[in-house]
Amino acid sequence: MILSGKEILKRKDQDIIIEPFNENQINPNSYNLRLHNELMVYENSPLDMKEDNAAKKIIIPEDGLLLESRKLYLGRTIEYTETHNLVPMLEGRSSVGRLGLFVHVTAGFGDVGFKGYWTLEIFCVQPIKIYPSVEICQIFYHSVEGEVDPYKSGKYQGNKDIQTSMLYKAVSYTHLRAHETTSH
């Protein structure tokens, strides 16, 4: 079941923490999150899943930044969130999507117990000018049935900045590396 906007407000500072919080950003069943003024872009192409790919920071000026089409930008929300006993999910706002701007490519699903800023995987189908502090996406909450095991991963928990991929740290790739050396 998805929580209503009124229920989000009722659970604020309990199961749901959003800082800073502004009641004007509440929707009927979600809360709008704003775009921070920093982005990151990967410096090399192609990227390698097994490597810590270098990225550089870009600042979005107040008068906007023109994004290139078919290029991945990593951004983050201004708002810090914590979610307890609920599953947080992130989606782009329909007005943003209608401009051909995607705010998450695949990672819109959060875990019970996640604490931090949401890293956005921003991708546009045509050049588009973006601005800092715009309400770019919305967070909504699902209730959980059954016993809850809170999120404990150290990869992204408690982040304070934009997070590039840490897939290279995954255990499965340690196995893959071992397999590569034995198969050659």
Feature-to-residue mapping (PLM):
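A generic local secondary-structure boundary/capping motif
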Residues: 20-23, 64, 108-110, 127
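Glycine-rich, charged/polar anion/phosphate-binding loops
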Residues: 16-20, 58-61, 105
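Conserved small/polar residues in nucleotide/adenosyl-binding loops
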Residues: 174-181
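Glycine-rich active-site loops that engage anionic ligands at enzyme catalytic sites
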Residues: 32, 40, 69-132, 137-150
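Short, low-complexity N-terminal leaders and the immediately following helix N-cap/first helix
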Residues: 1-37, 45-48, 164-173
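Short Gly/aromatic-enriched secondary-structure transition segments
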Residues: 42-56, 88-93
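Conserved, short, structured surface segments that act as functional micro-motifs
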Residues: 7-8, 12, 138-173
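A short mixed-secondary-structure module that forms the rim of ligand-binding clefts
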Residues: 50-70
